[in-house]
């Protein structure tokens, strides 16, 4: 329900996926939920790929995959919240494409949305973690608004529980072994 209300807003959608589970982190019918709002496609956890992987080819593969889901992003970024790769560029792109409006960060559970938001907040000079992060699905229970200014916010949305994600079928001990850190 919360995701579908974004279609009624005039905002930027920052769609975060996990590069190690691209298929499991795609949202079928995303366009239906977000309406005509522009989508900034953010592929997280790029630090876990070998440096020898051609980033341009990786980006092209991701964009082809997005197109299969009917997603035509205004831009695609390869980032790492954990290692702070491309975080400043992500903040610049969010500011460029949001045009003074709100930006909603959306994605399935465990793709690193809250970690990315914490790094973005740190990039603008704040210290500490504003948003709780966890390896367990569903940590963000409600929408969290972080003000950009007095008229607009960066909005962290709860992760969508996706049955195709393997993490929903693992015990705590197993999750620690398989979730990349």
What are these regions (language model features)?
Residues 1-13, 37-40, 46, 131-181:
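Helix-rich effector regions associated with P-loop NTPase G domains
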Residues 2-75, 87, 150-151, 179-181:
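Conserved C-terminal guanine-recognition region of P-loop GTPase G domains, centered on the G4
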Residues 18, 121, 158-159:
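Short glycine-/small-residue-rich Rossmann-like dinucleotide-binding loops
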Residues 18, 114-115:
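Acidic, metal-binding active-site segment of PIN/NYN-like and related structure-specific nucleases
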Residues 22, 83-86, 137-141:
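Short acidic loop-to-helix transition motifs that present clustered carboxylates
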Residues 24-25, 114, 163-165:
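Short helix/loop capping segments that flank catalytic or ligand/cofactor-binding pockets
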Residues 40, 48-111, 118-134:
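Canonical P-loop GTPase G-domain recognition
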Residues 113-114, 178:
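Short amphipathic alpha-helical patches
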């Amino acid at each position: 329900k919360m995701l579908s209300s974004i279609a009624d807003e005039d905002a930027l959608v920052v769609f975060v996926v996990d590069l190690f589970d691209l298929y499991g982190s795609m949202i079928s019918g995303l366009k239906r939920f977000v309406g005509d709002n522009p989508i900034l496609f953010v592929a997280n956890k790029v630090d876990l790929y070998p440096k020898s992987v051609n980033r341009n080819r990786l980006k092209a593969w991701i964009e082809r995959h997005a197109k299969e889901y009917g997603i035509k992003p205004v831009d695609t970024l390869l980032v790492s919240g954990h290692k702070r790769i491309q975080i400043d560029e992500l903040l610049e792109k969010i500011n460029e494409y949001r045009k003074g409006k709100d930006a909603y960060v959306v994605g399935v559970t465990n793709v690193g949305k809250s970690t990315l938001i914490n790094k973005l907040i740190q990039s603008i000079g704040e210290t500490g973690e504003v948003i709780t992060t966890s390896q367990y699905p569903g940590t963000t229970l409600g929408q969290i608004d972080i003000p950009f200014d007095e008229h607009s916010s960066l909005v962290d949305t709860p992760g969508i529980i996706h049955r195709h994600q393997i993490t929903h079928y693992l015990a705590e001990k197993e999750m620690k072994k398989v979730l990349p850190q």
